[in-house]
From Swiss-Prot:
It is an enzyme of class 1 (oxidoreductase). The gene is aroE. NCBIfam families: aroE, PRK00258.1-4. One of its GO terms (cellular component) is cytosol. This is Shikimate dehydrogenase (NADP(+)). Keywords: Amino-acid biosynthesis, Aromatic amino acid biosynthesis, NADP, Oxidoreductase. Pathway: Metabolic intermediate biosynthesis; chorismate biosynthesis; chorismate from D-erythrose 4-phosphate and phosphoenolpyruvate: step 4/7. Homodimer.
Length: 283
């Protein structure tokens, strides 16, 4: 881990409505302890009508930066100076000060790509990918894949109009397809990504036969409750490499911590075990 340059007390927070069940405090306090940084990370439940006042006076509330979650991500983009990633994704989840300027970024992109790099090195050798879903998470995934150099992304969604709208946003390398056409897009695809809630606890399963995927393909699922979805279980049974949603959750937290506390932390097996235990305890 990169060591901090200062020991001054720094505080960050998670702003949401509601935000009480986030694992972010557990993750950031683990890193603060490991790096010996005098700092804190707390949760602030802020309703939509109070969000602008809270963010514009973040320092007055005692914070040097913040994570932003539902339902504030789009509004955060408007109240800050966003970077290219936040603009492309259409949402900001991390706020930080650059002098007196409050800037924002979207670390879901880095979290997704870093998790793939850690879980399946060399995954980006494929020119083709299939992405399931066209919601907010899909925008971060598609942007990250295009930024990494993937040449063609088949984007499947139950609403083909929504898939087309996202494809129009990102250009000709993103091809919208009907949900029922997803199986036909799997042959030759070196990466399959599920960005939908299908397979999540309490949701219907993702009914997709992985047999057409190449033997060296990678399967990623953004769902992390349960830790191993049926999609990932089937992929592993076929000998395919996988990247789970918990890994993305951990990796997306790295950049925010670095921006606020001045040290780049590491995603370790110890941290993962800690968060896994918390997920099981609150299942």
């Amino acid at each position: 881990m990169t060591q901090p340059t200062s020991q001054a007390h720094i505080a960050a927070c998670l702003i949401g409505w509601p935000a009480a069940h986030s694992r972010s405090p557990l993750i950031h306090h683990y890193w603060l302890r490991k790096l010996g940084i005098e700092g804190g990370y707390s949760i602030e439940s802020v309703p939509p009508e109070g969000f602008a006042e809270f963010v514009l006076h973040l320092k007055t509330h005692g914070y040097s930066g913040a994570n932003v979650t539902i339902p504030h991500k789009e509004r955060a983009l408007q109240l800050t100076v966003p970077d290219q990633r936040a603009c492309a994704v259409g949402a900001a989840n991390t706020l930080y000060y650059d002098g007196s300027v409050l800037r924002s970024t979207n670390t879901d992109v880095e979290g997704f790509i870093s998790n793939l790099d850690a879980s399946a090195p060399g995954w980006d050798r494929t020119p083709h990918a299939v992405v399931l879903g066209a919601g907010g998470s899909s925008r971060a995934v598609v942007f990250g894949l295009l930024e990494r150099g993937i040449q063609r992304i088949a984007l499947a969604n139950r609403s083909i109009e929504r898939a087309r709208a996202l494809a129009d946003l990102f250009g000709e390398r993103v091809v919208p397809i009907a949900w029922t056409d997803a199986p036909a897009a799997l042959p030759g695809a070196g990466l399959l990504v599920n960005t939908t809630s299908l397979g999540m606890k309490g949701q219907p399963s993702l009914d997709l036969d992985l047999e057409p995927l190449p033997a060296d393909a990678t399967v990623a699922d953004l769902v992390y409750v349960p830790l191993e979805t049926e999609l990932l279980s089937e992929a592993r049974a076929r000998g395919l490499r996988t990247a789970d949603g918990l890994g993305m959750l951990l990796h997306q937290a790295v950049r925010g911590f670095e921006l606020w506390f001045g040290a780049r932390p590491e995603v370790t097996s110890e941290l993962r075990a800690l968060v896994e235990a918390d997920l099981v305890a609150h299942a």
